[in-house]
Amino acid sequence: MCNFSNDEDRFGYIVDTPEIRGLIDETQRLMREITDDAERVEALQPAFAKLLGADGWLPEQYGSPDLESGMGGGIGQYALYRAEDGSLCLFSLVIPAGASTPIHDHLAWGLIGVYRGEQAETIYQRMDDGHDENRADLEVSKELRVREGEFYTLLPPADDIHYVTTISEGASVSIHLLANDTACVWRHKFEPEAGTVEAFRSGYSNAACVNEEREPVR
């Protein structure tokens, strides 16, 4: 059974299913019991894999593109769960066939996996020391293909800057479990050829951010 909260309810279970509750309960338990980020993420992998392997828990509208999204390119970013204190979120990211995300970071540990379709991920390593908030020297460090049911970890600063392209015939849907309120925190968008960095907040397609007009924090 799947229940929805009103999209104006910014926090908690925006989509409430046993599968999502099972993952969030396990994540919160491990956040209390394990202090090391890498150990916590490793311990979370079975529960995350279980969610990726389950059918029927993701509503159709949260697996569809969004032509008005803050990510651009028809990319939909749909909140499924958000902790009120900003410590955890679960969301789906829908990328149309052939479309790519901007090159961006996440600023949080977590897990990302493909629920539907197939993606190519290009990961960057930052070569400069970050002293200039408007500039970045990036080099490609890895290129991966991620298929349905496969996932990878995020443990910033390692491998935190990337972009993703859908390489399947239809839109891809990835599921993100991250230790912040990802779409509502100020992150960074990169242009490697120009060497520039821009603060951005992608926003959710189905839930509002608090303090929409707040200036970005560098």
Residue map of PLM features:
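N-terminal leader/capping segments at the start of a protein or of a new domain
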Residues: 1-56
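A short glycine-rich, His/Asp/Glu-containing loop-to-beta-strand
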Residues: 69-97
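Conserved short histidine dyad/triad with adjacent acidic residue
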Residues: 91-105, 155-159
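Glycine- and acidic-residue-biased ligand/ion/polar-headgroup-sensing regions
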Residues: 108-127
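A short hydrophobic beta-strand segment most commonly corresponding to one strand
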Residues: 111-113, 169-184
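Ligand-binding loop in jelly-roll beta-barrel domains
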Residues: 156-175
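Long hydrophobic alpha-helical segments typical of transmembrane helices together
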Residues: 190-218
